[in-house]
Amino acid sequence: MKSRESLIRLRKFQVDEKRRRTVQIETMIAEFERMSGELEREVKAEQDRAGIQDPAHFAYPTYAKAAMGRRENLKRSTDELRVQCDDAKAALGEAFEELKKVEMLDERDQQREKAEANAREQNELDRIAAMRFTANGAHA
């Protein structure tokens, strides 16, 4: 029984770790998207300031080119994180299923033990009742 409790604690710990990892990745994705949006606004502002919208133009602002490059890097990183997030969610689902299996086994064992205890108690009560009946039957 002790080993089952340890296994349940282990499975809960694994679920918590996988949940934390998933949240961490989702937070990183949100942060990268926020940063990408800021870079997009900065590029637009720089283009408006220079009056040049075409990145191929010889006088296109250097800062805008650099910001576009950083934005593209962030988008690639975000895409990679989305794949990691999907994998983390799948791992979380598997860990949760493993936890549920162990908890169900534990619950089934507890129900069986309770039924056995109830049966023992009922047998003891039946034995006592039979002794009383025999004792009272002998006096009548």
What are these regions (language model features)?
Residues 1-140:
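Charge-rich amphipathic alpha-helical interaction elements
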